[in-house]
């Protein structure tokens, strides 16, 4: 299948069918307020929609054709608005990088872990990249141990997306993302501790 055909097929798949363009003789009709009206012929459903000065919109074909009475103009506007908000939300999620070395000292490791915690709590995803220098590459287990020690400092608010993997024979990379459930628990416990300290 050519790229043009694939694009056309995708466009047809995403096309919203409404009113006379609906290809089914019968549909399960849902009112604008979500009320289940029941099975109607397309003509009956169209008459009801026109009577309310609304559109008949096909919202599903599996396991049966389902159509809903809607103000299509408003429906289209709301859908575009929602898609835009989702896109903006995805854009706001930053991918940050934290660099480590196999022989990093405890103080430096804790400092970088603290910075990582701040980023995770903001919702950022983190790439932890450990760089081997010279003969250090022969001691891959040392790098794994360092990454494990680093993760121990953030595991109460994070999850590992991708386990440590060697890239370009020099970099041992691990990917982390914020864990919403863990963060909620952490913030709750932190709030309780603050309340105790204020007493």
From Swiss-Prot:
Keyword list, A-Z: Cytoplasm, Initiation factor, Protein biosynthesis
Name of the molecule in the record: Translation initiation factor IF-3
HAMAP family: IF_3 (MF_00080)
Annotated InterPro entries: T_IF-3_C_sf, T_IF-3_N_sf, Translation_initiation_fac3_CS, Translation_initiation_fac_3, Translation_initiation_fac_3_C, Translation_initiation_fac_3_N
PANTHER family according to UniProt: TRANSLATION INITIATION FACTOR IF-3, TRANSLATION INITIATION FACTOR IF-3, MITOCHONDRIAL
Recorded GO CC terms: cytosol; membrane
Primary gene name: infC
UniProt keyword Transferase present: no
Function: IF-3 binds to the 30S ribosomal subunit and shifts the equilibrium between 70S ribosomes and their 50S and 30S subunits in favor of the free subunits, thus enhancing the availability of 30S subunits on which protein synthesis initiation begins.
Molecular function in Gene Ontology: ribosome binding; translation initiation factor activity
Localization terms from the record: Cytoplasm
Protein family according to the UniProt entry: Belongs to the IF-3 family.
Lineage summary: Bacteria, Bacillati, Mycoplasmatota, Mycoplasmoidales, Metamycoplasmataceae
Quaternary assembly: Monomer.
